[in-house]
Design a protein with these regions (language model features):
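Residue-level signal for short hydrophobic patches within transmembrane helices
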Residues: 11-30, 34, 57-64, 141, ...
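Short alpha-helical transmembrane segments in multi-pass integral membrane proteins
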Residues: 1-18, 76-142, 186-242, 298-363, ...
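Hydrophobic transmembrane alpha-helices of multi-pass small-molecule transporters
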Residues: 60, 176-181, 206-210, 282-285, ...
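Helix-terminus/linker motif at the lipid-water interface of multi-pass membrane proteins
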Residues: 26, 30-48, 118-126, 182-189, ...
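Short runs within selected transmembrane alpha-helices of multi-pass transporters and secretion channels
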Residues: 69, 138-157, 165-173, 194-207, ...
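Transmembrane helical elements of multi-pass membrane transporters/channels
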Residues: 16-35, 138, 172, 201-205, ...
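Small-residue hotspots at the loop-to-helix junctions and early N-terminal turns
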Residues: 43-56, 132, 136, 195, ...
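Small-residue-rich hydrophobic transmembrane alpha-helices
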Residues: 48-108, 146-165, 272-336, 367-389
Length: 446
């Protein structure tokens, strides 16, 4: 069912809307983590490192799918808040066709350029390259379904339905883990089995998402004849979505630069970085949930011309985000020995991973304050500012990491401490802009 976020107590609405998103993200991270544990336990640390060596690249393609979907979702949430159904349907139909076309293009690019991206751009160690290529090419072939699922989820959230995506991800997550066990543990297919399991689970979530959307929402029910791309509408979606896709991609490109630095330190570093990154993604669950919620909350309220309610919602959203994140960070610090044992790391990788897990638990609360404001920027239509902040954080983090890793004080720990330094500066710049209040005059719909 649709949900009107323009009426009621903001923090209660934010929590109610965000919890299904958080649960869905948790499921996604759990099956990613299960994927890693299964590969590491049944195929060894080299296979684990091979999957981890292309992780930042898979995140980049996911970022493009999420970014353009958010752009379409923001526009549609503002039309929904303004009760303009005809324009809403036009934008939704065009967004579906556009995203599926982009997904096909990304699949083609990923499969054809895999060797260049992994060997040249990321500097993947020669010993890992065959396995990494195999995994990534299979993953890239399924990108069209990832793009399809993300636009279906964005359209549903724009109408205030965040629960449906939880059910889609539940099915996808369970299927992924079961297929991992069948293909990797049962059939001994190694990294290829893990990649196939991921693609099949994405196909399932995409198909279920569109079927649910068609059945439950007349606003989002289209015949094949109605699914046409209006060029003017597509241009508007790209205009709004491009800054958000660029923002998501900039963050991911930062990880590409860092991945190259990680690969420089060899297999133990790659394995430990893979594990710590999986855990870091779990810490980000409440943060991303509140960020996505703030985008929809701000979009609907700006469509209803209620900017003061957006400000109130942001303050309350930050408190919710920070409280949940601190609990998870303390739990990670307490559980470091258990995490190390679960992934079967050797002594060298375990030593590195301990430091990384602790530092990420210290740094992530900074994100809990920044990302809700980032979601608000997306929702009110300030895509340029959100992109600028991401570019600022990327530039600072890469500079800090590459400069400080050469010093005796930091060494390889600069790879993760650079994160806290760069995002602290970005947070300050973001909130200076927020308190100036110029965003209150923005609107994406006329």
């Amino acid at each position: 069912m649709t949900k009107d976020l323009t009426r009621g107590t903001p923090w209660k609405l934010i929590v109610q809307f965000a919890l299904p998103i958080m649960a869905g993200n948790l499921l996604q991270q759990l099956y990613n983590t299960a994927d890693t544990i299964i590969v590491g336990n049944f195929n060894g640390q080299q296979a684990l490192s091979a999957v981890g060596a292309c992780a930042s690249l898979t995140v980049l393609f996911t970022a493009l799918a999420i970014g353009f979907s958010i752009g379409a979702g923001v526009l549609i949430s503002q039309y929904f808040g303004a009760s303009r159904e005809q324009e809403l349907r036009q934008y939704a139909a065009t967004a579906i066709v556009l995203m599926l076309a982009m997904g096909l293009l990304m699949s083609l690019i990923g499969v054809c350029s895999a060797r260049f991206l992994l060997a040249r751009a990321l500097g993947t160690p020669e010993a890992l390259l065959p396995l990494t290529l195999l995994y990534f090419r299979i993953y890239a072939a399924g990108l069209v379904f990832q793009f399809g699922y993300n636009i279906a989820a964005a359209l549903l959230r724009a109408l205030g339905d965040s629960k449906a995506t939880l059910y889609f991800l539940l099915v996808s997550s369970v299927l992924n883990v079961v297929l991992d066990l069948v293909f990797v543990a049962g059939f001994g297919m190694g990294v290829a089995g893990a990649a196939i399991a991921t693609v099949l689970s994405q196909i399932a979530s995409c198909v279920i998402g569109f079927a649910y959307m068609h059945r439950r929402y007349a606003l989002l029910r289209f015949s094949l004849r109605e699914l046409q791309m209006d060029l003017k509408t597509a241009g508007r979606i790209l205009q709004v979505g491009a800054p958000m896709a660029i923002q998501q991609s900039i963050v991911s490109c930062g990880f590409l630069f860092l991945q190259r630095l990680v690969n420089y330190y060899g297999e133990s570093m790659i394995a430990s970085y893979t594990v710590a990154s999986r855990m870091e993604n779990i810490l980000m669950i409440p943060i991303i949930g509140i960020q996505n919620t703030m985008a929809t909350f701000a979009g609907q309220n700006m469509g209803a011309q209620r900017p003061d309610r957006v400000s109130k919602g942001l303050g309350q959203g930050v408190l919710v985000s920070l409280g949940m994140t601190l609990i998870l960070c303390l739990a990670q610090i307490a559980g470091i020995p258990l995490i190390i044992r679960a992934f079967q790391l050797d002594a060298g990788a375990a030593a590195i991973c301990r430091l990384h897990l602790f530092s990420s638990a210290v740094a992530i609360p900074i994100f809990a304050v920044y990302f809700p404001a980032n979601g608000m920027c997306q929702g009110v239509g300030e895509g340029f500012h959100a992109t600028f902040y991401a570019l600022l954080a990327l530039g600072l983090r890469v500079v800090f990491a590459y400069v400080l890793h050469k010093t005796s004080l930091f060494g390889y720990t600069a790879i993760w401490w650079s994160q806290a330094m760069s995002w602290t500066i970005t947070l300050v710049v973001c909130y200076v802009h927020f308190f100036r209040g110029k965003w209150k005059d923005k609107s994406l719909i006329s």
